[in-house]
Regions:
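N-terminal low-complexity, Ser/Thr- and acidic-residue-enriched intrinsically disordered segments
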Residues: 1-44
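Class I S-adenosyl-L-methionine
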Residues: 35, 39-403, 425, 436-444, ...
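Small/polar loops that bind or transfer phosphate-bearing groups
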Residues: 104, 203-204, 406, 559-560, ...
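Short amphipathic alpha-helix with an adjacent loop that forms part of the alpha/beta core around
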Residues: 115-119, 412, 569-571
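A phosphate-binding catalytic loop at a beta-strand-loop-alpha-helix junction
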Residues: 128, 402-421, 527
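Feature representing long, continuous alpha-helical segments
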Residues: 210, 214, 356, 388-392, ...
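Beta-strand segments within the central parallel beta-sheet cores of soluble alpha/beta enzyme folds
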Residues: 227-230, 409, 430-433
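PRPP-dependent phosphoribosyltransferase catalytic core
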Residues: 420-611
Length: 611
């Protein structure tokens, strides 16, 4: 150890290793491109090429990494842009104008792409409960999946002569590949949204834990693996299997970087064990022995004058400090060996680190009962996650102002848990729920009660849980949420050549905004295009008899017609950072140019755009 210390203190006679530094820089941007080599870490150049290419890059070089048929397509899918947008649904929202919480309906792959600019490095906690790939619950089939027969050949389950190489390939091969191809791009996009000290928790079971661990190692980096916790999900075992009854599942935890520090948790304390025999003003305490075999050896004097030489837990300086602070207790009227005090109030404040065995959290059966009570004893969801599980995760990994994302939100347990946490510590955590509006089968109770898709139940769960928390605690927190739906772009597609249109169609294209789109639709797309959070406060007011929208202090927009110099002079007094008009808002190009020049003259900091 001494030699190592000397080597660290000694100045290196060589210049710094630029190759290693470059590898470190690349690992921050593309941790999945870091692999093992004979002499340490190296770059997987084929994978790096794929990250930087819009086309599929071929390569067959052997290396240590997880491969499956369709992986390159999955990487390409994560990197490819989307032409979709989000549309606000005010009537379905709660406190739309004031809330900072979001509920987004749509395919989470597209939604994650849309959120990349607005929420880049802003999400502190991600919790997801994705499909476990049991063979029954797979719903996210992306359009980049390769042909099934082609996969059998690529994966070695068939050769070019159509001969089967392993048994039962129809269920064994594509089964895992589809799941991996679904998860990979979503996790890759999710990582971009995490803060530098951000963290992700993923619920999973034995079907894919091995594969999930490998792709998370690749996407987040092996150094950012925090834990694989085991959670008891059943209170009683089911005797449905031939061998061992499974009563657990996993929660895989990764950070974005080494900056992540989890909060300590409140310890379980039996307060009856804490006493205060000497009326210490700091309150009740328990004592622990000061002796420790192999520790520092010295002599102490008890309160009765007895001298004791022992091997102690503390250095003599620490012992004297504890003694001066009246933290040493001598039993048997001062004759016994010293013990140090651990005060109840200090124990509560300090907290403890969590471990990997989570057995004190509610079971899935208890969570089902909890949700049934919320919906007047009606069963709409099978085995939702317990609120106290997600609440524990939120408490463990967030502070009061953080943003929490769940892009497989299901029944919106995460939203419920975030509101619970805020009610306890008066926090202002924000949630973003993303859920595919999966249709509900007509024979189910939920459908008969008027719920046509899962999203409708989820939103109602947030409303009901919010009302319950408010009634139970009277906490002054954000109970609202803005609803957005994934949809096609607000702009008409104009990929055809001009000769492909007739004159009447060309006249319509002068205004390329789809006729069914509202001002709120356009405003939302502008917020996203400019990389602003969807939770910003939106106000409206009139300027020269024209309606103007103001998004915080970041963006002004007016979609009325006949924008002129008079309007420009008045709006310039607001000194907007950005202002947007429709291209058709101006009578002609000269009018548009005049407004732009006038704004530049009267408000030089204003950036003007048209759509």
């Amino acid at each position: 150890m001494k030699n190592n210390t000397k080597n660290k203190e000694k100045l290196d006679s060589q210049s710094s290793n630029l190759i290693n530094k470059n590898i470190e820089l690349i690992s921050e941007l593309f941790p999945n491109c870091i692999t093992e080599s004979l002499d340490g870490q190296s770059i997987d150049f084929e994978l790096l090429k794929q990250e930087l290419s819009k086309d599929i890059v071929d390569g067959n070089k052997e290396r240590y990494r997880l491969e499956w048929p369709g992986k390159r397509e999955a990487i390409l899918s994560a990197n490819s842009p989307t032409n979709k947008t989000l549309r606000p649904i005010r009537d379905d929202s709660v406190d739309f104008d004031t809330t900072e919480n979001l509920y987004i309906e749509g395919d989470n792959l597209e939604v994650l792409k849309i959120l990349q600019e607005s929420y880049l490095s802003k999400i502190k906690l991600i919790y997801i409960d994705p499909p476990y790939n049991t063979g029954k619950d797979f719903v996210y089939k992306d359009n980049f999946n390769i042909d099934a027969e082609e996969e059998l050949i690529d994966s070695g389950q068939k050769n070019e002569y159509n001969e089967r190489l392993v048994s039962n390939p129809d269920t064994a091969g594509r089964y895992h590949s589809d799941w991996l191809s679904m998860m990979y791009p979503r996790l890759k996009l999710a990582r971009n949204l995490m803060t530098d000290d951000g963290i992700i928790f993923i619920s999973i079971d034995d079907n894919e834990i091995h594969n999930l661990r490998k792709i998370c190692d690749e996407i987040f980096g092996t150094n950012n693996f925090i834990a694989n916790t085991v959670r008891r999900r059943r209170l009683s075992q089911a005797n449905l299997t031939k061998n061992i009854s499974t009563i657990h599942e996993y929660i895989l935890i990764y950070s974005k970087s080494s900056k992540t520090v989890l909060n300590k948790i409140k310890p379980k304390i039996d307060e009856s064990e804490y006493k205060n025999p000497d009326n210490d003003p700091r309150g009740p305490y328990v004592t622990m022995p000061c002796t420790n075999k192999g520790g520092a050896k010295y002599t102490i004097t008890t309160t009765s004058g007895k001298k004791i030489e022992e091997e102690w837990r503390f250095k003599i300086e620490t012992y004297k400090k504890l003694e001066a602070e009246n933290r040493i207790f001598f039993p048997r009227n001062g004759e016994g060996k010293p013990r140090y005090k651990i005060f109840l109030n200090e124990k509560k404040e300090k907290g403890i680190l969590p471990n990997t065995w989570w057995d004190s959290i509610s079971s899935n059966q208890e969570a089902t009962t909890e949700l049934k009570k919320l919906f007047d004893d009606k069963l709409y969801f099978d085995f939702p996650k317990p609120v106290d599980l997600i609440q524990f995760i939120v408490e463990l990994s967030t502070n009061k102002e953080d943003i929490v994302l769940d892009f497989f939100s299901g029944s919106s347990t995460t939203a419920h848990a975030v509101m619970n946490c805020n009610s306890v510590d008066k926090g202002n955590r924000k949630f973003i729920m993303v859920q595919l509006p999966e249709k509900i089968e007509e024979n189910l109770i939920a459908y008969k009660d008027g719920y046509k898709n899962i999203s409708q139940i989820s939103k109602e769960r947030i409303r009901r849980s919010g009302r319950k928390i408010k009634n139970d605690t009277n906490a002054k927190i954000d109970y609202g949420f803005r609803v957005y739906q994934l949809d096609s772009s607000n702009m008409e597609e104009t990929n055809l050549k001009i000769q492909d249109y007739n004159q009447s169609e060309l006249d319509l294209l002068e205004n390329n905004i789809k006729p069914d789109r509202t001002d709120n639709d356009l405003l939302t797309q502008l917020i996203l295009n400019w990389g602003l959070p969807l939770s910003l406060k939106i106000e409206s007011f009139e300027v020269e008899a024209k309606l103007v929208y103001k998004v915080a202090n970041s963006l002004y927009a007016c979609f009325d017609d006949d924008i002129d110099e008079k309007f420009a002079k008045t709006i310039a007094k607001e000194k907007p950072l950005r202002i947007v008009f429709k291209d058709s808002s101006f009578k002609n190009d000269n009018a548009k140019s005049n407004v732009k020049q006038l704004l530049k003259q009267l408000s030089p900091e204003t950036e003007m755009k048209v759509i």
